[in-house]
Amino acid sequence: MPVLRTKTSRMWLPDALRGLALLNMLAYHAMYDWVYVFGHESSWYNIWAPGCHVWQQYICWSFILLSGFSFPLAKRPAKNGLIVAGCAAVLTFVTAVFMPSEAIWFGVLHLNAAAVLLTCLVYPLLQRLPAGAGLAASAALFALTNQLPEGYLGFENWRLCAVPTGLYKTNWFWLGLPDLTQFASADYFPILPWVFLFWCGVFLARLWHPGRGEPPAALRPLCAIGRNTLLVYMLHQPVIYGALWVWHTVLG
């Protein structure tokens, strides 16, 4: 998600990967609005189809992992986290007021802000862990808690065991314990399991050191998009919705 920027020479490959994920996000959300908001049929786009699920997961995994990778590179991560938290609050207010059926109560921006601020608190402890061991442990915990919001431990369709239902009555949706009888969010990325994927990125930054400097000319537009992730994220839905509304009502 949002880039934690530095004033030093940037690593261009993470920017390019982030830009690629952003372009996929724009295409995915454009298709979602076209099919599920404006009611058009599609022969291939179905959010419940395995292919679309993999597409959606690639996008969110990329953002969260790269956000974690960017954390150690930031000079003021707490400030960045607070900025993202403010943007997340704006997003919740706007969607709750103007699109209540599509309200976002704890989406990927909220997760990114929470992960950054939480990591600021525990970063000295994370630094004590060997990078390889920390990466492996974070990946294992992410897999183990992947379906915690759905009521069990396990990854995707692999169910290890059910979680006591009483834990969900608190409706701590932000943590990953939603009461699904009363909670709904159009975009939902709770702290558990996703903070563990963020920490995978934090540890990966100690193991992987892409080169710095100018990117290849062909990748410069992609890198430029990747350097402005937060701005693109905040603007993309209004722009996509407006363009599709014109197409639907005027041209369609």
Language-model region placement:
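Alpha-helical transmembrane segments and their immediate juxtamembrane cytosolic regions
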Residues: 1-252
